Swiss-Prot record:
Domain of life the protein comes from: Bacteria
Cellular component GO terms, alphabetical: cytoplasm
Note on cofactor: Binds 1 divalent metal cation per subunit. Can use either Co(2+) or Zn(2+).
InterPro entries the record matches: Dehydroquinate_synthase (IPR050071), DHQ_synth_AroB (IPR016037), DHQ_synth_fam (IPR030963), DHQS/DOIS_N (IPR030960), DHQS_C (IPR056179)
Keywords tagged on the record: Amino-acid biosynthesis, Aromatic amino acid biosynthesis, Cobalt, Cytoplasm, Lyase, Metal-binding, NAD, Nucleotide-binding, Zinc
Major localization class: cytoplasm
The protein's name in its UniProt record: 3-dehydroquinate synthase
Binding positions for Zn(2+) per the UniProt entry: 184, 246, 263
Underlying gene: aroB
Length: 355
């Protein structure tokens, strides 16, 4: 299946197909002329797929080098970025060459940032290997790295030339790594796609059920992301809906120490906490918090953060990218499949941190 991201200045396709990673070279050859390519990945993904993708690209006429770094959210920083820059220089990459981001969200965010800033921008594509990356972070052109202050605090908007999604690679993920991606899938059902929510309701929550329906879950999620990105590429309006659960979720990730709590886990806890307080305030429908909680628990996602410290979380919230002046654009769900923006002051935001 192909999904067109029809952004006027940079349209591209998402290709979703079981086994398509084996044809990575042919796919890229349709996008780029033969040239130098650097595959950016982490050490874990490299051990599974780097050689396979490298050979496929070489067979298609590309000159390929591989840069891998130690896996983990804690490596998504400017120190790693500098190492990639140095590698690109040593390989002699010019503005006519490109980067292949092969990995999960950490790899995709970092490689995209490098591509968008090296020589003021070179071409890149995404080959996501985690569920979170396949349904969310590889699509839409947000790149970035973390700082000690906040997640993704330094970043750019830069669209890839294409996204290649192979659902079969999810079978090599650990249980926790697969399940955390369901945090984003559940979010899509809540903010835009009641049909997806209905499917999630039917599934029993097992790893087997996720893998069996992975292609459908990915397609639904990508269609929601496509709609939001095409209508609002730069995150000023409808695309903000994608941040449901992320305001508190990002704060949890930052205060826990990057890599301690996985992104989808933090999103799940963020959705539950925001919904609980918003429902108490009459801003979200009665009973929706219970529905979200039960859905997250069914798939094995955490719903409560054990190291809850209001002051630390609040400090992290003050660096949220949805903040404008003293106002934060909070995303709420007005009804199943429909989201709204609810502006609150930073002071009011403290209410949403009360357990």
């Amino acid at each position: 299946m192909k999904i067109r991201i029809d952004i006027p200045h940079h349209p591209y396709d998402i290709q979703i197909e079981k086994g398509c990673m084996a044809q990575a070279g042919q796919w890229l050859r349709e996008l780029w002329q033969p040239q130098k390519v650097v595959i950016v990945t982490d050490n874990h993904v490299a051990s599974l797929y780097a050689e396979k993708v490298k050979l496929s690209l070489e067979d298609a006429g590309f000159q390929v080098a591989v840069f891998d770094f130690l896996e983990g959210e804690e490596r998504k920083n400017l120190t790693t970025v500098q190492k990639v820059y140095e590698f690109l220089v040593k390989q002699g990459l010019t503005r006519s060459d490109g980067i292949v981001a092969l990995g999960g969200g950490v790899v995709g965010d970092l490689a995209g940032f490098v591509a968008s800033t090296y020589m003021r921008g070179i071409h890149f594509v995404q080959i996501p290997t985690s569920l979170t990356a396949q349904v969310d972070s590889s699509i839409g052109g947000k790149t970035g790295v973390n700082t000690p202050f906040a997640k993704n605090m330094v970043g750019t908007f830069a669209q890839p030339d294409g996204v290649l999604i192979d659902p079969l690679v999810l079978e090599t993920l650990g249980k926790r790594e697969l399940i955390e991606g369901m945090g984003e899938v559940i979010k899509y059902g809540l903010i835009e796609d009641p049909e997806l929510w209905a499917l999630l309701t039917e599934l029993n929550g097992s790893v087997e059920s996720i893998l069996e329906h992975a292609e459908t879950l990915i397609e639904h999620s990508c269609q929601v992301k496509r709609k939001m990105v095409v209508e609002d590429e730069l995150d000023n309006g409808i695309r903000l809906y994608l941040n449901f659960g992320h305001t508190i979720g990002h704060a949890i990730e930052a205060t826990a120490g990057y890599g301690k709590v996985m992104h989808g886990e933090a999103v799940a806890m963020g959705m539950v906490q925001i919904s609980k307080v918003a429902e108490e305030k009459g801003l979200m429908p009665a009973g929706i918090t219970q529905s979200i909680t039960e859905m997250c628990q069914k798939f094995g996602l955490p719903v409560d953060y054990e190291n809850w410290e209001v002051d630390k979380l609040y400090q992290a919230l003050t660096h949220d990218k949805k903040t404008r002046g003293n106002t934060l654009k909070l995303v709420l769900v007005s009804e199943l499949g429909s989201a709204i923006i609810h502006p609150v002051s930073l002071e009011e935001m403290k209410d949403y941190l009360v357990k």
